């Protein structure tokens, strides 16, 4: 079948008629379907049920350094959680802040802080006039919705088999109003692309005109391999350090597709200056 963009108008009308009939037939069945995305099936949830037995009235609520987790916790997370999530992201433990169960909430909070307070002592984005944000497409609509919510102008960057088109990215960041880019570097939806080594190195070497430009590196699927041999992603934080450019990356991950999505852990990792 030819792509819709290559078909004549009459053929498109005929196809629309067929699809409309199919849609009407589906509606007549009055199905109640759960169309939510990224939702583990009951069989996967059953794999982690034993986690519910790890904490009881006698054991399991004291951390290795004696913090009672039944009470208020630590601002940046308990040591065990920081160690686990640091290992997942391939970063030092002291760069990690553990949040709630939603990495998307942490991304929202980071962008909100950038607009309201600025980045690393810089001028708040809200006071800088027009703000642009790079959005690799196809990509994650909820990322884009965050920056759109705060009034940023979304600028599309086409994806390639290597990741975002870096020639385009490098050209756009010459504009000081471009403040960041959204990235899902491993198994990026919907194409499942993992960024190439060259793409990661070019991100690490970026010298944007805006000092407060940040790569929002959502490494959501960093350990989510479907097969015994998974893809390998070059470590952006380490590559950026080689370029003395580690401030440029803000990394996120979570356990939402590993254990129970509603009660997992999310984390942000960034340089000490950030």
Model-assigned labels for residue ranges:
Residues 2-80, 86-87:
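N-terminal "arm"/small-domain region of PLP-dependent enzymes with the aminotransferase-like
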Residues 30-32, 178, 249:
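Core-facing hydrophobic residues within beta-strands of well-ordered domains
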Residues 37, 159, 254:
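Active-site donor-binding loop signature of nucleotide-sugar glycosyltransferases
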Residues 67-211, 222-244:
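Conserved core of the PLP fold type I
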Residues 218-219:
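Walker B catalytic acidic pair
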Residues 222-224, 232-274:
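Active-site PLP attachment segment
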